[in-house]
Amino acid sequence: MSFIAALPMYEWPETQADTDMEWQRFREFFRRAGIDAPETIVRRNAEMPPVPGGIRDASGKVIAPDPATLPPDELHGPTLWRHPDLLLCQTCWGPLELGLDEHVKVVGQPNYSGFEGGEGPLYSSPIIMRVSPNPPWMEAALKRGAGASTASARELAAKRRGVDKPAPDDGLPDIPLALIRGKRFAFNAFDSMSGFLAPSRDLEAIGESLDIFSERIETGAHRDSIIAVAEGSADVCTVDCRSWHMAELHEPKAELVQVVGWTGRRKGLPMITSLHTPEDVVERLIEILSPP
């Protein structure tokens, strides 16, 4: 069986070399375990093997188009995720909850501990707005005084280094209702956990909803949501903590926005394989991708 693999969820033009290195590490681990991992990852529809008649489930129902019928230089996530030759790929819990779980197997979770707002397999999303010279949360922290609590000390430290509100230690949601009410909300996709479903669920948990926003604007990508807020075509967005870290490193317009709150911690992007992957290979994938 010839496998394909992809790592598209955290790849920007500036990070392609990093993604290639990440795949090289995976590939070597897999090959040492006897898995015939592909040399390179898929980045375009044209690089996926064709599936004449479309990708079908066990009942014969078409669940995704033949990659050969798609625009060759684009990458269609729903087709990639359902491709019968898929060895490994990232996806999002949103699509999984909305039906993708019937067609794939989850084999691992990445570690988010290296990012503000992450802890092991859990991540959270910073709530992002345009920079304000005197964010209300900072004034509240100053009034409480330094040393009043660990959180206060962290907030004051954040004030010294910039304008971002730090992620709560307990991982609970920190939703600044007064700041976001009536604002225009940008999001990457309706099935995105970090960009849409997480803020929706955290608002519902406190008796609110996305109706708190005056408008919802679908951007297609976390980076585009950040840019929309920076440029003023939207007022607020949420992106997962690793994407925000990437924006701080690579997106110049990230300097025009700030973190004003956080969604609660929840499971980050899962790693999946096809239902057609042999069971012994699935077991080895799970073993390799499990935390030490």
Write out the residue ranges for each language-model feature:
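Ligand/cofactor pocket segment of small-molecule handling proteins
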Residues: 181-241
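A ligand-binding cleft/hinge motif common to bilobed small-molecule-binding domains
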Residues: 91-101, 205, 230-231, 235-255
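A short secondary-structure junction signal
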Residues: 138-141, 196-201, 228-230, 249-250, ...
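N-terminal hydrophobic or amphipathic helices and topogenic motifs
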Residues: 1-105, 109-122, 135-174, 178
